[in-house]
């Protein structure tokens, strides 16, 4: 009986040492990020160490950059009169046409209650990995995405998902 207790104490000590050495970071978008209001009723957070990039004002894309990483936001007018599921398939088709591999689609639950789609994959030509959070309404498609090289993407994915999922759009205009 004493040997079992000693074994348990040793086991708890080893687990404690390993757990203390783990590096676990918690990200809070509203504490660690910057609020960006993209228009009437549309807002999201981006990391405070990313900088708003002055890109082409005519392409309608807002970019936030840090080294080899980019967060972007864009709104596209819906050209088709389809329901959300059909628009999701059309967006998936657009990504596939731009030669992406390992494309996965899922529907995460956002705290804001928005029904959106998450597209995750990589571009064949550039090797960049991406995750796009896409929200469809009757008139527009809203895309908030993260793209980076494989190393940075893998390292920062959990953190970036917190920011992507901070996207909110109110229906009150």
Give the role of each language-model region.
Residues 29-39, 64, 107-110, 121-122:
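Short acidic-hydrophobic surface loop/beta-edge motif
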Residues 92-139:
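Signature of long, low-cysteine stretches enriched in small and polar/charged residues
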Residues 142:
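Glycine-rich phosphate/pyrophosphate-binding loop shared by adenosine-nucleotide-utilizing enzymes
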Residues 1-2:
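N-terminal secretory signal peptides that target proteins for export/translocation
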Residues 64, 72-74, 117-124, 134, ...:
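Short beta-strand element of the conserved SAM-dependent methyltransferase core
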Residues 5-9, 15-60, 138, 147-173:
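N-terminal targeting sequences that direct proteins away from the cytosol to non-cytosolic compartments
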Residues 39-88:
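Secretory pathway targeting signatures of secreted, lumenal, and periplasmic proteins
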Residues 36, 74-81, 120-121, 146-153:
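Second-shell loop/turn segments in exported
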């Amino acid at each position: 009986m004493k040997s079992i207790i000693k074994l348990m104490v040793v086991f708890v000590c080893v687990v404690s040492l390993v757990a203390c050495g783990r590096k676990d970071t918690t990200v809070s978008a509203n504490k660690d990020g910057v609020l960006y209001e993209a228009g009437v009723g549309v807002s999201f957070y981006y990391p405070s160490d990313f900088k708003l990039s002055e890109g082409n004002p005519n392409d309608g894309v807002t970019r936030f950059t840090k080294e080899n990483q980019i967060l972007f936001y864009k709104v596209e007018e819906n050209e088709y009169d389809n329901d959300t599921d059909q628009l999701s398939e059309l967006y998936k088709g657009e990504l596939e046409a731009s030669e992406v591999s390992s494309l996965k689609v899922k529907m995460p639950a956002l705290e804001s209650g928005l029904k959106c789609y998450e597209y995750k994959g990589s571009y064949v030509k550039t090797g960049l990995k991406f995750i796009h959070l896409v929200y469809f309404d009757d008139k527009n498609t809203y895309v908030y995405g993260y793209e980076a090289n494989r190393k940075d993407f893998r390292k920062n994915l959990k953190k970036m998902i917190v920011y992507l999922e901070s996207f909110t759009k109110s229906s009150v205009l």
